[in-house]
């Protein structure tokens, strides 16, 4: 049996794309997954291009893999960097055998045997394609509810790499989730660039349904106990959506609300479509209707033209919302984006200092949040067995929890009392 090594860089959608490629390849011929690149017959790097760092890592990895691969092994590059660099990847790294874009993963079996094949059509519609079945974790499933993005944020390369947004028909989603539940999954993660923009456009159907309606429809699936989703867009967080999030017992009380900046003037330049006040209002509504919810966010510092006053607006939102989780980065100019051409680029040292201030303050907030968990009881869904005699899972609000236990806990939702806290996880005992 041939062996497959696949390295996934970037977001949850890339993880799901990797699962899709594994499933498609195995429908053509059996592959055994390996963590050892030296024994692999096929090596795939599934790439991210949101920032420059993972792009640079790609070419470093290609060099390493080419050095250690066995004779005859193939190297393929997939994902967002594949979409935006295309054949230039092969020009820069001739050892690469094929390139397949983020919108074309269903074609993996077509390109794998074609020397220097390049498939990067960002208009290709995979919304009704019946992918094979494969899950990295048997106890939970990730499901794409849409592909692409219809926004034009001036800092973001994703629309150029994943194409315009198309929603996947709800009946197909119900079928996919029902199959996952039948094979052991009690939790589903719904994926999309802007999940709550679901239903704006379908490729092959005239269906009329929005994200709130989709959540209600999926909630009726028997045996499905938990629903998560990422990422919603603040612009589409209407009252009906927030009410559904707060009141539906199957929806986990964890929500990602990408801020990017707390400055209304910068948000306008970013083309985000909301103001600081709009954002705070939506978070306040979530906290009011669902006090137990955890809110996470994305923040970019050093965006072109960012003043100290702009940055202080971001810090003010951090203080007011007290995000439980923060994904924060220095602005990274990306090709095919408006912001890369802006004149007022911020000095890297200033951006770095602001990032440190932001992360330091968030760390203080996070310590307070996690310390307050001591003695509390959480419902934890256990899905991973560790090598040290411990089992890990997630609470309803998304916190990572460890307990002493065995594989008998896997796939079960159990009450756990927290006995130890740390910044990244909680330790508990079964109640």
Curated annotation (Swiss-Prot):
The keyword Manganese does not apply. [4Fe-4S] cluster 1 binds at residues 11, 48, 80. [4Fe-4S] cluster 2 binds at residues 149, 153, 156. Residues 371-431 form the TRAM domain. Its cofactor is [4Fe-4S] cluster. It holds the Pfam family TRAM. Catalyzes the methylthiolation of N6-(dimethylallyl)adenosine (i(6)A), leading to the formation of 2-methylthio-N6-(dimethylallyl)adenosine (ms(2)i(6)A) at position 37 in tRNAs that read codons beginning with uridine. This is tRNA-2-methylthio-N(6)-dimethylallyladenosine synthase. It comes from Sulfurovum sp. (strain NBC37-1).
